[in-house]
């Protein structure tokens, strides 16, 4: 499971992504060049800041807020964005709250957001941009065409990184079946997997911001990554030191800086190999990753299989009778595992010759 970064910002962007009725209303105001200040919140803390204006309490619609934004005051919407509570209201946040904004709307929006920890949106009349505030978060919404261009560039980059990862992984597969994998091969595969996943995270951010305009990008992403993260986690589980929790190791690798990720010795250290030569240290996989590729074998059976034999090489050497002794594996499943591993080995050898 990936560590969630900027979770609060992603939630905000989801609310305001293209295709939502709120974004439609904001875009209408933007095109009209009237400017606007909108607050999402109906709790007492927000309502105490409202001075004057009209208590509308009307159902929300993009057309309504477009018309109401023509007045100078702020609009107050319910947190679920289903009703418009106030229009043309003056907001009176605490003036001692620091803000580096210059325009009146933006200063008020930032202060309200900091004071109440609710979403405040300022639409600039002259600069033609939408700025969102919540707590200490400030984010300027970008045009969909700009985000789409960045997302397409990121997809192209991802394709190249996935191609490199596939080459590295296939090389590791060959070495694992021969029990000749070195620490260098393993750390390189983990490094490349993490690089791919970081690009995936960036693209997922673009998809959230694109809303319904990001469907094609989302389809391309799903086609490219498939089971890459799962394979990466199982790779760590195969090679991390016995007493280490593989999920904790995965989290530590996610927290590495871009510079540290380029250092294979640091990745080896995270796996528990301190002061070991990357090239000269032979390591044997436990077999979680390769066993997981055998079709129709439940995860609990794989746990029992690896728990019984300990290493992939012993699983490969085991006959049907030995496999049959493992809990959850009968005669039919033993044959399925043996044949499945044989087919995977043949496929790996075939890829080597391509």
Curated annotation (Swiss-Prot):
Keywords, comma-separated and alphabetical: ATP-binding, DNA damage, DNA repair, DNA-binding, Magnesium, Nucleotide-binding, Nucleotidyltransferase, Transferase
GO biological process terms on file: DNA repair
MF-aspect GO terms: adenylate cyclase activity; ATP binding; diadenylate cyclase activity; DNA binding
Transmembrane as UniProt keyword: no
EC number(s) on file: 2.7.7.85
Entry annotated with the keyword Transcription regulation: no
Membrane-crossing segments per the record: none
Quaternary structure (record): Homooctamer.
Reactions that this protein is recorded to catalyse: 2 ATP = 3',3'-c-di-AMP + 2 diphosphate
Domain DAC: from-to ranges: 6-144
Cofactor(s) needed by this chain: Mg(2+)
Family that this chain belongs to: Belongs to the DisA family.
Matches recorded under SUPFAM superfamilies: RuvA domain 2-like (SSF47781), YojJ-like (SSF143597)
Entries under InterPro entries matching the protein: DisA (IPR050338), DisA_sf (IPR038331), DNA_integrity_DisA_N_sf (IPR036888), DNA_integrity_scan_DisA_link (IPR018906), DNA_integrity_scan_DisA_N (IPR003390), DNA_integrity_scanning_protein (IPR023763), RuvA_2-like (IPR010994)
Protein name: DNA integrity scanning protein DisA
NCBIfam families: PRK13482.1
Source organism of the structure: Clostridium perfringens (strain 13 / Type A)
Residues given in the record as ATP binding sites: 73, 91, 104-108
Entries under Pfam families matching the protein: DAC (PF02457), DisA-linker (PF10635)
